[in-house]
Curated annotation (Swiss-Prot):
The M ring may be actively involved in energy transduction. Its main location: membrane. The lineage of its organism: Bacteria, Pseudomonadati, Spirochaetota, Spirochaetia, Spirochaetales. It is found in: Cell inner membrane; Bacterial flagellum basal body. The chain crosses the membrane at residues 26-46, 469-489. Belongs to the FliF family. GO terms for cellular component: bacterial-type flagellum basal body, MS ring; plasma membrane. The keyword Transmembrane applies. Residues 320-339 are annotated as: Disordered. This is Flagellar M-ring protein. Keywords: Bacterial flagellum, Cell inner membrane, Cell membrane, Membrane, Transmembrane, Transmembrane helix. The keyword Transmembrane helix applies. It comes from Treponema pallidum (strain Nichols). It is a multi-pass membrane protein.
Length: 567
């Protein structure tokens, strides 16, 4: 094997050397083209397979942009070819988007229903072709309905009868659909989605009418009985209208409350009721107005109105005058035949007279305005009633304290004056856009509120505070009295103790004097007196104290003062 490869290489080298430059260039070009072909083939085969959304190219740019925009809303990536063919990633996505486009009337009018459903036409016998068409329609419509997000499963039966000889004997095409919604689906109560399934069937089967389509759910409830939905739609419309009226009433209520509560306070403005009548029926109004013609405009520099306005302007005027004089002659019929001239004119025949006739014709031009409008809704009569409480003032005595009688504070009610009520009524009328032509009604009343429970709570709180203040005052007075008694007792005790100590000191001093006198007398008499150790120490201590008092009188005075303060 190796020798053969070696010989092959030698032969190729030898042959390559023998070739001319042109032959070498041709070989290199062929090899390059082959490599490029392989690369293009691999790239093309690696691309994902796209499924056409509609087999018919869409040339209308506006319709194509609407379809692309709807696909983008569903997060579906689509490509558009140069001829206008829209493609998506897979068949399942294509079926789901076809259903959405059919439901929302985004399929172009010139698109063949067969192109939408991608049903092939079979060119065999008529019987086989009809069977294949029916089977293809059933399968395709079933797949499209299953592709919907709200549908778990579906069964479709379409009956296409044989062609009859006479149109009166021709039976209609019928279709029955059984859908099995998903557990969280609301398709059974959404009319728009059911209508989308009906459009799907009508596009799939030419000649199929709405009255011949029956769509039921797993409970055998007919879903496309739109006549039965009329009552529900009417109730839903009434509910929306009532919500609209309630929202408008809430806006007016907030406006009126904000206006009055800023003046009288939140607690004095209550019982606000607003009723707005609104005609929500759709009406077409046509109005023709004949307006005067302004010949000269008003000069803004003058303080008065110098404009000139006329009802009309003469555009064409014609005057004709006829004068006739002579014998009147009424022609009869042929000779021997009585004429058909009335008797009144016969009496005027063959008379001589003078007749003048003047005819004036004028064509007046007027200004005309025509207005055609659809009026809905129309705000009707507005009724507002609000109650404003007067002012309650607490009575005080000459000392500025509240007057309390039988456990309650006496109060005085001051009503709102009639002039102030008129001003408040005018303010409310301006706030709601009062119109006497609509027979609007605004009532601002001054009815005294029942504040019994409120006053009871307020009086109870006031009396409780007063009682607490009295208790605190008496407690403080009691504490002050106790402290005063204690201080008096302390002063008296100190005074008694001081006097007792003075008596003891005086007694000791007298005893000391008597003892010293006895010693002195004994010394004078020459007697030998012996002293005890305690007496000797007391004498030494007294001498030391006396000596210190003589040497340091200030220190001794400070020491005595400290003893007195401690006592």
């Amino acid at each position: 094997m190796g020798e053969w490869l070696g010989q092959l290489g030698v032969k190729l080298k030898t042959q390559w050397k023998k070739w001319t430059l042109v032959q070498k260039s041709v070989l290199a070009g062929a090899a390059l083209v082959s490599v490029m072909g392989v690369v293009v083939l691999l790239t093309w085969s690696a691309k994902p397979t796209l499924v056409p959304l509609i087999d018919t190219p869409i040339t209308d740019e506006t319709v194509r942009e609407k379809i692309i925009l709807r696909l983008n809303e569903e997060n579906v990536r689509a490509t558009v070819s140069s001829v206008g063919l829209i493609s998506v990633s897979d068949e399942k996505t294509a079926r789901r988007m076809r259903s959405i486009l059919i439901r929302e009337d985004l399929i172009p009018k010139n698109v063949d229903p067969w192109a939408i459903f991608d049903v092939e036409r079979w060119t065999r016998t008529d019987f086989e072709r009809r069977v294949d068409v029916r089977r293809a329609i059933n399968n395709t419509v079933t797949n499209h309905i299953k592709a919907l997000d709200d549908i778990d499963d579906a069964h479709v039966v379409i009956n296409v009868p044989e062609d009859a000889l006479f149109q009166a004997d021709q039976k209609p095409i019928t279709a029955s659909v059984v859908i099995f919604p998903k557990p969280s689906s609301t398709i059974a109560s959404e009319r728009k989605k059911i209508e989308g399934i009906q459009k799907l069937l009508k596009l799939a089967v030419p000649g199929l009418k709405d009255e011949n389509i029956t769509i039921v759910d797993s409970d055998a409830t007919v879903l496309n009985d739109f006549e039965g939905f009329k009552d529900a739609d009417r109730l839903s419309l009434i509910e929306k209208q009532q919500k609209m009226i309630a929202k408008l009433e809430s806006q007016y209520e907030a406006k009126v409350l904000a206006l009055l509560q800023k003046t009288y306070g939140k607690d004095r403005v209550r019982d606000l009721n607003i009723k707005i009548e609104m005609d929500l029926s759709e009406k077409t109004s046509q109005t023709t107005k004949y307006l005067p013609i302004e010949i000269r405009q008003d000069n803004p520099d003058t303080p008065w109105d110098d404009s000139q306005v006329v009802p009309s302007v003469t555009s064409i005027s014609e005057t004709a005058t006829t004068t006739w004089q002579g014998t009147g002659l009424n022609p009869e019929g042929p000779p021997g035949v009585e004429g058909q001239t009335p008797p009144a004119y016969k009496d005027m025949s063959n008379q001589v007279g003078l007749s003048n006739q003047s005819v004036v014709k004028k064509q007046e031009a007027i200004s005309k305005s025509e207005i055609n409008e659809v009026v809905s809704p129309v705000l009707g009569r507005r009724t507002v009633s609000v109650n404003i409480d007067g002012e309650w003032r607490k009575k005080r005595d000459e000392h500025g304290r509240f007057i309390v009688k039988e456990g309650h504070i006496e109060r005085e009610y001051i009503p709102i004056s009639a002039e102030e009520l008129r001003e408040a009524t005018k303010a409310v009328q301006d706030a709601i856009g009062f119109d006497a032509g609509r027979k609007d009604s605004v009532s601002v009343l001054n009815i005294k509120f029942d504040r019994t429970s409120e006053f009871d709570r307020e009086d109870e709180h006031y009396l409780r505070v007063q009682q607490r203040n009295m208790i605190i005052l008496y407690s403080l007075a009691s504490v002050a009295i106790v402290l005063f008694i204690f201080m008096v007792y302390k002063v008296i005790s100190k005074e008694v103790e001081r006097r007792r100590r003075l008596r003891e000191e005086e007694l000791l001093r007298q005893q000391q004097l008597m003892r010293e006198r006895a010693l002195w007398e004994a010394e004078q008499a020459g007697m030998n007196v012996s002293m005890s150790v305690e007496e000797r120490k007391r004498l030494e201590l007294q001498e030391n104290v006396l000596n210190m008092a003589r040497e340091h009188p200030e220190d001794v005075a400070l020491l005595v003062r400290t003893w007195l303060m401690e006592e």
